[in-house]
From Swiss-Prot:
Name assigned to this protein: Triosephosphate isomerase, cytosolic
Cell compartments where the protein resides: Cytoplasm
Origin species: Stellaria longipes (Longstalk starwort)
Subunit structure: Homodimer.
Family note: Belongs to the triosephosphate isomerase family.
Amino acid sequence: MGRKFFVGGNWKCNGTQESVSKIVDTLNEPTIAANDVVTVVVSPPYVFLPDENAELKHEIQVAAQNCWVKKGGAFTGEVSAQMLANLGITWVILGHSERRTLLGESNEFVGKKAAYAQSEGLGVIACIGELLEEREAGKTFDVCFKQLKSFARFPAKPWDNVVVAYEPVWAIGTGKVASPEQAQEVHVAVRDWLKTNVSEEVASKTRIIYGGSVNGGNSLALAAQEDVDGFLVGGASLKGPEFATIINSVTAKKVAA
């Protein structure tokens, strides 16, 4: 397949200088899978971005959890993609369900933010996913495809730096996790959508990762699925040793190959 495994850690609104330092120490250990087989990106709150970008070994990249839709201006409390790029931040998470549901971010708004972030050279972790009632109503694909459409305004080339994160909302922070078969089913559908609506090349190369109660106990089975190209990890990414286990689940790709 040729798609490099990708593991992102979304720390959300968590962490103190002490706890963050412990996670960094773990991630800097040589037991973490090599950079040539897995891309590791951590996403701390804004206040920790400069320090973690400096303190983490160079193989580990840093992402912001959000950015503003424009260059800057009179937008109190917002941070622009230009500012992030100036700090040396390389990725940004956009479209996370918590921002969609709690802050009312629409598909269109998320798409505009992603397009601007790309224009500033940031890689985008593009989040999609359905609510429990939408899954039970058989609307999983419809919901995910509508969300994908908002990201499809990218020209072909910038898709090289886009990772699609399928995060079923019913599995985020609930302890429930999609089965490996459920994850694979949606990832295949997403790849087919990209093939039809963007290009066959983009569909083949784009990494589609899974998020939603991923932990050290289930990551290996999920990673063994052909179209699961990695993870976006929430709570478990705050536990250094467990996050390391998830990163090292890339070994499942070698077993499955």
